[in-house]
From Swiss-Prot:
This is ATP synthase subunit alpha. PANTHER family: ATP SYNTHASE SUBUNIT ALPHA, MITOCHONDRIAL. It comes from Pseudarthrobacter chlorophenolicus (strain ATCC 700700 / DSM 12829 / CIP 107037 / JCM 12360 / KCTC 9906 / NCIMB 13794 / A6) (Arthrobacter chlorophenolicus). It comes from the Bacteria. Belongs to the ATPase alpha/beta chains family. The record marks 374 as: Required for activity. PROSITE patterns: ATPASE_ALPHA_BETA. The gene is atpA. GO terms for molecular function: ADP binding; ATP binding; proton-transporting ATP synthase activity, rotational mechanism. Its main location: membrane. F-type ATPases have 2 components, CF(1) - the catalytic core - and CF(0) - the membrane proton channel. CF(1) has five subunits: alpha(3), beta(3), gamma(1), delta(1), epsilon(1). CF(0) has three main subunits: a(1), b(2) and c(9-12). The alpha and beta chains form an alternating ring which encloses part of the gamma chain. CF(1) is attached to CF(0) by a central stalk formed by the gamma and epsilon chains, while a peripheral stalk is formed by the delta and b chains. It is a peripheral membrane protein.
């Protein structure tokens, strides 16, 4: 048998040749983790030492998960889907991708889930690209001050709490006080801008529904479709039946879709309905991940949850395309308590709040905006000049009216000036009432507010103020060019005011009966004028309830 010999030079040469031809890129490293526990939409996974925060993981049955807690021995994973098929011991693989959603104009008119998957049975969506959910908000130098108006079509808001493009305006109030109605009216009011075809005017809208009933979301979609607003709106839906992880991610998915348009130089309006339910979902997820609870059992970073979301709404500088994203977050309060944890957090983050009062809503004052508590911190710079001029004294007059109304409940007799304040205040409150899904063009609002603040409605009975307003606006549309002039110039000058005064005097001649102070219209009978003695005896008496 021949003796086996090893030549050291041959071994050395073979190793050198292998090292020279070796390409590290051809080697593939695969990390595999295993599920240790899975329940309540949360899985704990051992292994995967190189996993990234917010990386997508894939379970054996194809379900995706989101890596959250990166502990030394295991990972806390939010399961994005049905967790019933995930069991202990199953393999988990990395995808190497952070959570992102598809974006693009193809999403307009569609209803998608928080992962960007269509759920409206209208086929697949061809996305232009994808965008990560966790993105840094624009910095200070990338922004521009808010200076363009975002019209809601609601007189009470556009006159006293104006909103600008790029602003974050909180809508806060108890349940069933009309919060969603204001947001939907604002979306519907963008129809004229969309129909104009002018990119600088058009506003793409995103409605993020968090934790609502599926029937409610379907009703919102139908309302938008009936009013011609669905074609420029995307609905991101995470109904109450969704896992808590989906409700937590839905607002970020909506903002990612909006940011794509904003950085493309377009204008976006995004509605978060509502962030109270997102905070509750995040609390549930955090407690299941065994994170330390804080005040009201919310995790310590619940402020950061909302701040990093709302800071993405901005008016970009001209160098970045001058696009904007306006945010309307909604918060539900309990018993009108705005001093609770989540409401105070979001109030401190946003640029103002619209507070809806349940007492006003129940008194049929809708929209039920409490003007005394509501404020817009930056929207005043974006208000059109004509509206700023006519509404300058409106907030003060309403405040004086509320004070006098409280005083009149206990006073048996009032002087003429006090009665005048009550007369005008009651008519201004009636003027601010507005039906749902019937937003007003800004020029119509200017004329209505002008008529109220200048005393032209003082001789109109309160119950006929809305009819007077409707018929006067129709009169102007058919017999005057004042509305067209206001729409084009947005300026209420002396000539326009004089023409308006002349028009309203002429209109009253046909609207009022001859020689008396009562209206004669459809369903109204003429009466004799009240004598001066009877007027002097007018008293305001507190009504017993």
């Amino acid at each position: 048998m021949a003796e086996l010999t090893i030549n050291a030079d041959d071994v050395r040469n073979a190793l050198n040749e292998f090292a020279a031809s070796y390409e590290p890129g051809n080697a593939e490293r695969v990390e595999v983790g295993r599920v240790t526990t899975a329940s309540d939409g949360i899985a704990r996974v051992e292994g995967l030492p190189s996993v990234m925060a917010n990386e997508l993981l894939r379970f054996e049955d194809g379900t995706l998960g989101l890596a959250q807690n990166l502990d030394v021995r295991e990972i806390g994973v939010i399961i994005l889907g049905d967790f019933t098929g995930i069991e202990e011991g199953q393999e988990v693989h990395r995808t190497g991708q952070v959570l992102s959603v598809p974006v693009g104009d193809a999403f307009l008119g569609r209803v998608v889930d928080p992962l960007g998957v269509p759920i409206d049975d209208l086929g697949e969506i061809k996305a232009e690209t994808t965008r990560a959910l966790e993105l840094q908000a624009p910095g200070v130098t990338q922004r521009k001050s808010v200076h363009e108006p975002m019209q809601t079509g609601l007189k009470a808001i556009d006159a006293m709490i104006p909103i600008g493009r790029g602003q974050r305006q909180l809508i806060i109030g108890d349940r069933q006080t009309g919060k969603s109605a204001i947001a939907i009216d604002t979306i519907i009011n963008q129809k004229a801008n969309w129909a104009s075809g002018d990119v600088t005017k058009q506003v793409r809208c995103i409605y993020v529904a968090i934790g609502q009933k599926a029937s409610t979301i379907a009703a919102v979609r139908q309302t938008l479709e009936e009013n011609g607003a669905l074609e420029y709106t995307t609905i991101v839906a995470s109904p109450a039946s969704d896992p808590a992880g989906f409700k937590y991610l839905a607002p970020y998915a909506g903002s990612a879709i909006g940011q794509h348009w904003m950085y493309g130089g377009k204008h976006v309006l995004i509605v978060f309905d509502d962030l109270s339910k997102q905070a509750e979902a995040y609390r549930a997820v955090s407690l299941l991940l065994r994170r330390p609870p804080g005040r009201e059992a919310y995790p310590g970073d619940v402020f950061y949850l909302h701040s990093r979301l709302l800071e993405r709404c901005a008016k970009l500088s001209d160098e970045l395309g001058a696009g904007s994203m306006t945010g309307l977050p909604l918060i539900e309060t309990k018993a009108n308590d705005v001093s609770a944890y989540i409401p105070t957090n979001v109030i401190s983050i946003t640029d103002g709040q619209i507070f809806l009062q349940s007492d006003l809503f129940n008194a049929n004052q809708r929209p039920a905006v409490d003007v005394g508590v509501s404020v817009s911190r930056v929207g005043g710079a974006a208000q059109v000049k004509s509206m700023k001029k006519v509404s300058g004294t409106l907030k003060l007059e309403l405040a004086q009216y509320r004070d006098m109304q409280a005083f009149a409940m206990f006073a048996s007799d009032l002087d003429a000036a006090s009665r005048q304040q009550l007369t005008r205040g009651a008519r201004l409150m009636e003027l601010l009432k507005q039906g749902q899904y019937s937003p007003f063009p800004v020029e119509d609002q200017v004329v209505s507010i002008w008529a109220g603040t200048n005393g032209h409605l003082d001789d109109v009975p309160v119950e006929d103020v809305n009819r007077f307003e409707t018929e006067f606006l129709e009169h102007l549309k058919h017999k005057s060019s004042i509305l067209t002039t206001l729409a084009q110039t947005n300026v209420m000058d002396d000539d326009t005011a004089a023409a308006l005064k002349s028009s309203i005097i002429d209109f009253k001649k046909g609207f009022f009966g001859e020689g008396d102070n009562h209206l004669v219209g459809a369903g109204h009978e003429a009466h004799d004028a009240i004598s001066e003695g009877e007027v002097d005896q007018e008293k305001i008496v507190k009504q017993k309830r």
